[in-house]
Amino acid sequence: MLAETIAGYGNFTLIEGDVMKLPLAEVAAEQFQGLEPVLCANLPYNITTPFLTECVRAGCFRQLTVLIQKEVAQRICARPGTGEYGAFTVLMQYYTEPELLFEVPNTCFMPPPKVTSAVVRCVTRRERPVRVVSEESFWRTVRAGFALRRKTLVNSLQTGWQLPKERLAGIVESCGLPPTVRGEALGLEEYARLADALAAAE
């Protein structure tokens, strides 16, 4: 039906398929050569996190404006030290500048879902907010930092870095962080500084 509806429009291309299997960067380069495309979508809640992760890492959209579950929107825009703040937050804020625009109550849908939704705009950063020696070490540190949320950062880091606990504690303190700090308390700058120190020590 949609194909018939847009048949007369030369500026509309319908691509049918599973978006999670779509090579986004290739499609964007082919369809929007020389342009800075934006993405607007009402995302299925079950693919929100993996789809947005793929989008921001591909870097093929200037901006993403999406309708998603409110709880996920809050995670994207969360600040260090809050319950919503996590590795996904760091990922989204590393690649984009996110802003929660407004909430959408479940009464706007038929049938109404059991959750509230929200619209989030994520503008792709022209430059990374922090500089790191190695992005691989940075993400390794971020993943480890949130691996054991109820434990101290030193304990969590052991899941990703094969260094003695005493050595890890020394590195954490050398970065100006208290030995009892938890991973969710660190912002992007602290994670960048810590990742560089860990990479140098390994």
Question: For each of these PLM feature ranges, what is it?
Answer:
Residues 118, 122-124, 130-168, 175-178, ...:
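An accessory alpha-helical subdomain
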Residues 1-140, 173, 184, 193, ...:
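Catalytic cores of RNA-modifying enzymes
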Residues 153, 177-201:
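Conserved AdoMet
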